[in-house]
Swiss-Prot record:
Organism lineage: Bacteria, Bacillati, Bacillota, Bacilli, Bacillales
Domain DPCK: start-end pairs: 2-197
Name assigned to this protein: Dephospho-CoA kinase
Name of the coding gene: coaE
UniProt family annotation: Belongs to the CoaE family.
Gene Ontology biological-process annotations: coenzyme A biosynthetic process
HAMAP family documented for this protein: Dephospho_CoA_kinase (MF_00376)
Main localization (coarse): cytoplasm
Residues spanning the membrane: none
Organism annotation: Shouchella clausii (strain KSM-K16) (Alkalihalobacillus clausii)
Catalysed transformations (reactions): 3'-dephospho-CoA + ATP = ADP + CoA + H(+)
């Protein structure tokens, strides 16, 4: 079974992913793969430079994430262009990793995909687990975690699909507004149910 783990920005998805790994469930991290596919020498980086210009590279030839972020956040068309380059490369890597885990005998593999809904990747998973927090908590965590201004944080939240729409399509909802222990209990219960499916 492939479980799609997702959640809004700063919802606590990483907390859940770490807990799942500690339970012996392999987690394939889309964000980690997204960083790997844009390393120097990778085809996706060459496409990004061709699309957005040399100024998105640092002096050492690596991607200047801050520069690229400034270009795409708040510009729907440019963000779409970037996604059309990076997402296919990430999907291919995720599938390859999940296949390897299943070949090794794992019956459950988690695909940690922040933009599962936005990229319509339901076909890659059997179940969708959504980690969520209320908007005020999300905003506070994002400002604290990434050192953003309130305006920048609100822009990043607005760039994602609304939580209410995501909840309607999720198989498992994980409320991360409370304590870590409460979140862990919800994940443990959800795992117990999947053991019989």
């Amino acid at each position: 079974m492939r479980i799609g783990l997702t959640g809004g920005i700063a919802s606590g998805k990483s907390l859940v992913a770490t807990y799942l790994e500690k339970q012996g469930i392999p987690v394939v991290d889309a964000d980690k793969l997204a960083r790997q596919v844009v390393e120097p020498g990778e085809p996706a980086l060459a496409q990004i430079v061709a699309t957005f210009g040399e100024h998105v590279l640092q002096d050492d030839g690596t991607l200047d994430r801050k520069q690229l972020g400034a270009i795409i956040f708040g510009d729907e068309q440019k963000r779409k262009q970037l996604n059309e380059i990076v997402h296919p490369a990430v999907r291919q890597s995720m599938k390859k990793q999940a296949d390897l885990y299943e070949q090794r005998g794992y019956t459950r593999v988690v695909l940690d995909i922040p933009l599962l809904y936005e990229s319509n990747l339901f076909h890659m998973v059997n179940q969708v687990w959504l980690v969520y927090v209320d908007e005020a908590t999300q905003l506070r965590r994002l400002i604290e975690r990434d050192g953003l201004t309130e305006t920048e944080a609100k822009q990043r939240i607005a760039a994602q699909m609304p939580l209410t729409a995501k909840k309607a399509q999720a198989d498992v909802l994980i409320d991360n507004n409370g304590t870590k222990e409460n979140t862990y209990r919800q994940v443990y219960d959800a795992l117990a149910k999947t053991a019989h499916e």
